[in-house]
Amino acid sequence: MKKTNEKKIANKCQIFTPTNYVKELLDSVGYHKNIVNKTILENSCGDGNILVEIVNRYIEEAIELKFSNKKIKKGLENNIFGFEIDKNQFEKCICNLNLLVKKNGIQDVEWKIYNEDYLKSEVNIQFDFIVGNPPYITYSNLSQEERTFIKDKYETCRQGKFDYCYAFIEHSIKSLSSEGKMSYLIPSSIFKTVFGNKLREFMVKYIVEIKDYTKEKIFDNALVKSAIIIVDKKDCSEKIKYINMSNDDGLYICKKTIRKKWVFSNEFNIGKKRFGDYFKVSHVVATLLNKAYVINEDMYDEADEYYKVGKFMIEKDVIMPTATPRNMRYGKEEKIIFPYKYIDNQLIKYTEKEFKNLYPGAFSYLTKFKEDLIKRKSDKKSKWFEYGRTQALLGIKCEKLLISTIITDKVAVYRLDEACIPYAGMYISLRDEHQEYNFGFAKEILESENFMEYVKKVGINISGSSLRITSKDIEEFNF
């Protein structure tokens, strides 16, 4: 079982650091001068593209200092460390390092490169430098065994759905000497995601600089943007230097005033009234299998009391209008099978027998997807023909606004009536029907330049110029 888990992790770690970012990582901690007697670690080294640059810099300085090849060899063996969990990448790494030193007339180096999981290693050294690009594996892609191990060992991962790299960051900072420095290329979502809060609390006192690649796509297949964090154990600065690498804009952020979500701006959200005090922002329904419930306009023909979908006659009484921000944008209409009913605004669930008897057409249609519906990770009390998540159903029967969780260039807000059951985005409802601010005002606020500027600061950078926001982000906006 252990080997299987390690292989799965290894397969998910095969993203290597481009050369220009390798140099930026090393330059950021000053690994270019006075380095021959300093220890350095790369703890997820892949085929060695960072280690090759490290060794090259080491040899260059050693030659300048007139070191003999024998002395250089000894220095390489005593000062440069690496870990790589994948056997094939480990062997490539050793091969690449041997080719490099051979060009300089050095052979038979006994490298301190280990073919093992850094998080489970018993190597106990305090390093002068740690540089790297830790493996980025989401919580959902970790085995239960790995989740349990990491939760038990790392304080930043005790709660919530942590990412694998959180443990690497914690372990690395703890492995630095009292004057050690670290530079790590990390997903910039770490600064803002809710599950990264404990990690941010842990590392804020050590971070001295952040280089944020807000526009650049460093890794071809990665959805999130990246940043370099720079740690200096001996620097007790009360501020973090922040640089937006897309335009070289920089500022200093006071550590004492930094919030749970790290926002890199000294002028931020300065309005007097909180949006969430007047409007509630909620998640829409989650069917967990949209293809079973959603019927687009090209799929059906309308009859008196039915929608004909293929050979199925689905009863109109069990069909509701639906919407997504994307379909609203392009003017597309869709319907959704709604296997519930409301009586006096209370959600009523059917038994399987009731639903089959009342709506045999809809029941037969859903039965076509029964195998996939059963496989969903649904709420424990959800029946196979119901939506996977039911929480949103308790408050969604109301007039509302619809907004996307992904914002690109501008915010678009759509007005929906009480009957509409959206299945993507977030919906906004009134806190009080008699309050001074209505939906028209809310739409105006959310489509304003001020809100867009706010989104640019609180949103998580993903592909292109797109940003991901949460319901809490919207509620916390001050106008």
Where are the predicted features?
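Short, ligand-facing micro-motifs at secondary-structure edges
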Residues: 211-212, 404-421, 453-462
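C-terminal substrate-recognition regions of SAM-dependent nucleic acid methyltransferases
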Residues: 8, 12, 217, 227-401, ...
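Signature of N6-adenine DNA methyltransferases within the class I
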Residues: 10-11, 15-24, 38, 44-52, ...
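Conserved SAM-binding loop
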Residues: 93-94
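A short beta-sheet element
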Residues: 409-444
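Short helix-loop-beta connector
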Residues: 32-39
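Conserved SAM-binding motif I beta-strand of class I
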Residues: 80-84
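Conserved SAM-binding strand-loop segment of SAM-dependent methyltransferases
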Residues: 106-117
